[in-house]
Amino acid sequence: MASPHAENDMVPEMIDHRHLQMWKWLHSRSGARGNTSETSFESSVSVSTNSFDFSADMSRSIDSSSSRMLPSPITNFVTPSSSFSSHQMHDIYSLAASYLQAPPPPYTPTTAFHPHNAHQLLLLHNMTAAVQTPEDPDIDVVGLADTTNLVSLNDKEDEEKLDQTTESEESDRISISTTEECPLDLTFKPTSLDSPTSSTFIPLRPSVIIDHHIPKPHTSVRRSMSSVSSSASSTQEEVAAHFRRSLSGKWPKRCKVNSEEARNSPLRRRPSFNTHTSVSSLSVHSVSPTPPVTSSAQTIIVNNHCSDTTLSVADHFRRALLGKGLFDFQRKSNK
């Protein structure tokens, strides 16, 4: 029969008490198959005794966490008994209870972790994702992608416009600051002779009536007698119109009229001068005789050309007042 000391020599080192009890129980079972019941009983008793001693020694070094997990000390289950069956059953129950209540041993992987394994797994995942592309893409995803691209393009355009506006504002601010810093130029600058504002030409005062029908000098123009007569008549008409506008109802007041005839004669309307009877009636009631023309009488000159220089200013006013026909008739009768 093997001694307890020989069995203790076969126990591996660095093992906890639960595994030690299991190992001893298995060896006790294997030894009991080859020996008699008496030897097995003695070996079991020796094993139980050794386990009791070892468990008593290990119970002192168990930490608080292990003692909290075990509701009762292991020595209660491994007490030696006289009967073989009861001792064997208590030993099995104690081993099972201690094994189930103990935490599992820490997991130690068989192969060491290599740093390149994570990179290889990520590469494999990317390759499988690239191969398994969806045949029918989602419409919402495509629309969202297009909208995102459009918004990004619009944002880029807005940023470019904002940059341009800021640059223009900065350039305007710089130009304004430079103009404000420059002093005003108050020096007197003589105007050049070629400028239109400094022309020395002083326009002469125009005459009373300007004849636009007289040809310019140094021009060879051949015109018929009808055109010449029409130009002369138009000039005289312009002179007569000018004096008619100048009268404005003041010329009759300056005429010398007999005061007695003016009081006695009734007021009458001005007749027309188209008929012979009106001319004969007006010849009786004519105005005062025309004063003699003196050398100091002013003449009307139109553009230094005048067709009739015998008429004075007073004659022109009389002609405008009486009319052309009556004035010519009175003038002929006076001659």
From Swiss-Prot:
Region Disordered, annotated ranges: 153-174, 218-239, 254-295
Top-rank taxon: Eukaryota
Biased composition (Low complexity): 222-234, 275-295
Biased composition regions of type Acidic residues, renumbered to the chain: 156-170
Coiled-coil portions: none
InterPro entries linked: TDU_repeat
Name this protein carries in UniProt: Uncharacterized protein R08C7.12
